[in-house]
Amino acid sequence: KENPENRRKLLCFTYTPYDDGTLITEADKEKSKKPNSEYAFLACFDVELDSQSKLVSYKRISLSENAAEGHEKWFAYMEYAGYADVMRKEAIDTFINITHEKYKQWFGGEFGESVPTIFTDEPQMIPKKPLEHACDKSSVILPYTNDLDETFKKKYGISLLDNLPVLIWENASGIPSPLRYYYHDHTTERFAEAFGDNIGKWCEENNI
């Protein structure tokens, strides 16, 4: 609660917008729901799917715009969860300070001897949740963090947020999008750097 930026985040890609007073079009208001947790609006899209619910086209639009006739309007939100953000180095720095440094304060003299290691139970990003089927109108859950789009764009030269639909549906062309690989590659690397490298360095420096 004191440091919400250190809490784990998820990206919710949903057909049903959150009703917080900011919705503009009547169509959005009619299909809206109350949010279950703290969140921030990220983007919305005009999505065109074919008869097999494969992705034909998409474009990022504003909240005030409706999707074109025959298309669907989808929304993306960043939500906060209760676990530490394992893709954010600052969050893991704080985690180390309130756990590992306390262990060191009390038992540091035994590090490398009777205390050979410190156990952390299954550190992980938020579990992914896909659509149940391609024409499903529920929500997709994906790992996310505040600056993911910024670091993604810096590494790959393309915006993740501008192209979210290609993570959700198969392309009608049958050609896989490299953005899917980029997304999984980048989130995995962010996790490895923020958690594994960070805690590994501390352990090496402290003889465990």
Regions found by a protein language model. Name each.
Residues G200, E204:
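Anion (oxyanion) recognition and catalysis
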Residues K1-Y181, T188-E189, E193-F195:
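Mature extracytoplasmic enzyme cores
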